[in-house]
C-alpha cells in the first residue's frame, strides 16, 4: 500500500516508426525507452536520415486462449465498474434483486467454479438462453457441442458456487438490472465455450541501429470471444503485411512519444 501511495510517475520517451509493404502501412515502437529526452531526439534525427527499415526477425505462433472463469461477486463488481461504471454496492444491490427474482444464483459467493452436478444442469440453462434476444443466436450454436469444463471443480467450490443464471428467463427488467444480468449470462456462455485460437506474428525491425517491435494477431477461431465480440484489452491487433527476415522496407515516418510510467496492479 505504501508503495502505491508513494508512487511517482516518471516521464520517458519512445520512438514510433511507420513503415509499409505491399501498400499495408503499420507502426512499430522502439525497444528502447529513453529516460532523457535528448538521446531520443538524437536517435529520431538519425532515423529521419535513414530511408529504409530492415526486418530482423519474424516469429509466428498459434496462441490458444482459454475462456475466463465464471464470476464470483468480486470479479462481477470489478467488471461492472469497468464496463458500466457501477459502484461495488450498486452491483451487489442489483445482483441481490436478480437473485430474489430467481433469475441468478446466490450472489455473495467467493467461488468462480461450479460442481459437477451443477455442470450437468448447464445445457438446459443454455437452451433457455436461446430465447433471450441478445444471446439467442450464440446459445443456439452451442447446442450439441462439448462444453468447456474449465470452471468445473468440486474441490474449489466454497459454500456457494459461481454466479450463473437460473432456468427462469427474465420478463421485464430495468436497464441496470438487464446490464448486470447480461454480464452474468454472457460470462456463463463464455466460460462454457471453446477456446479462442489466434495466429500471432511478432516482428523485430532495425533502423539506424535502433530496434523496433510490432505484434499483430489474426483470430482463426473466435470461440468464447464471439459472445460479446470485444477486443482484448491492450491487444496488439495491427494488420501486418507478410514480411520475411532480411526484407528492406521504405521508412514512412518517425515520431517521438512522451509517456509516463504507471503503477502495475496485481
Predicted feature locations:
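Core catalytic DNA strand-manipulation module of type IA topoisomerases
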Residues: 1-264
Amino acid at each position: 500500500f505504501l508503495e502505491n501511495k508513494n508512487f511517482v510517475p516518471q516521464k520517458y520517451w519512445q520512438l514510433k516508426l511507420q513503415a509499409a509493404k505491399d501498400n499495408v502501412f503499420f507502426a512499430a515502437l522502439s525497444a528502447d525507452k529513453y529516460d532523457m529526452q535528448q538521446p531520443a531526439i538524437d536517435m529520431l534525427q538519425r532515423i529521419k536520415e535513414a530511408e529504409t527499415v530492415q526486418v530482423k526477425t519474424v516469429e509466428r505462433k498459434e496462441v490458444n486462449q482459454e475462456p475466463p472463469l465464471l464470476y464470483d461477486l468480486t470479479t462481477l463488481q470489478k467488471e461492472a465498474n469497468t464496463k458500466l461504471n457501477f459502484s461495488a454496492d450498486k452491483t451487489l444491490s442489483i445482483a441481490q434483486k436478480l437473485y430474489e427474482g430467481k433469475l441468478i444464483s446466490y450472489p455473495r459467493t467467493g467461488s468462480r467454479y461450479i460442481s459437477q452436478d451443477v455442470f450437468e444442469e448447464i445445457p438446459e440453462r443454455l437452451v433457455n438462453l436461446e430465447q433471450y434476444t441478445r444471446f439467442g443466436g450464440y446459445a443456439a450454436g452451442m447446442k450439441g457441442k462439448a462444453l468447456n469444463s474449465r470452471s468445473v471443480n468440486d474441490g474449489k467450490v466454497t459454500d456457494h458456487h459461481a454466479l450463473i443464471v437460473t432456468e427462469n428467463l427474465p420478463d421485464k427488467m430495468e436497464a441496470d438490472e438487464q446490464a448486470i444480468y447480461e454480464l452474468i449470462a454472457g460470462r456463463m456462455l463464455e466460460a462454457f465455450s471453446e477456446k479462442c485460437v489466434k495466429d500471432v506474428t511478432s516482428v523485430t525491425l532495425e533502423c539506424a541501429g535502433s530496434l523496433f517491435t510490432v505484434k499483430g494477431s489474426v483470430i482463426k477461431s473466435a470461440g468464447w470471444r464471439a459472445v460479446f465480440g470485444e477486443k482484448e484489452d491492450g491487444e496488439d491487433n495491427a494488420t501486418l503485411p507478410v514480411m520475411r527476415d532480411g526484407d528492406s522496407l521504405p521508412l514512412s515516418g518517425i515520431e517521438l512519444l512522451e509517456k509516463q510510467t504507471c503503477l502495475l496492479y496485481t
